[in-house]
Amino acid sequence: VAIVPDVFGGAEGVLGADGLGDKRVNIDFKNDQISILRSTGPVRANGFTRIPVKLRYGHLLMFDVTLAGVRPRAMLDTGAQSTIGNSSLRAALARRKRQGVENIIIGVTLDAQKGETLLAPAVELGDLTLRGMQVTFGDMYIFEAWKMTDTPALLIGMDIIGLLDSLIIDYKRRELHLRAPR
């Protein structure tokens, strides 16, 4: 289940992903617009980075990223307020001896979990590089539920997604299209 946050002018609510199998979701953060259309062909979008995705559990978007030479399993979660990484990713990045700040992550069920928040190395998504993002690392329940505790994993939340100008999720074609601010 995805949550459309308040960036859409107060249109906060739950968007069920189960019915999106043949759809394309266009989110224009710059103009506070969202549209859900039938996916009828390739996205012809100038200025976008195209990233192939795999769907897990029917709607969880998984794709390749690189952080300081580490290639974690990455997921996009429009229902997550913050970006989180599992302890395996933190260990893989441990050669960077940065000290983080203890933080609390509150899940959709209002369970609170402790983590360590720190500035992550640049994240490469295709030909797009994101810098200066904060990630909270820890043994979060979501990684256990998705059986991703033993391998580095990163869940990219709205703190990062919302910095983009636009995002297109094409469930039928299994593609993610990102446009960075100009």
Segments from the language model and where they lie:
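Pepsin/retropepsin-fold aspartyl endopeptidases
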Residues: 1-182
